[in-house]
Amino acid sequence: MFKKIVKSIAAIKTENDRDECYWQIDRAFEEERISYEDHELLYGLAGMVEVA
């Protein structure tokens, strides 16, 4: 799951893409598929991606 989300983050081109990534991250955490630490790390990475 972690790798799938990282790939989604790498593909961010718009704010909608970023929102979709945030949703995926939250859902994976709620389903206990990623840890809290991974949740925070992925949120940080998604927030760093610049969009046009």
Spans of model-derived segments:
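N-terminal acidic leader/helix
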Residues: 1-30, 43, 50
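Short, charged early-sequence alpha-helical segments and their helix-coil boundaries
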Residues: 36-52
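Short, charge-rich amphipathic alpha-helical segments embedded
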Residues: 28, 33-38
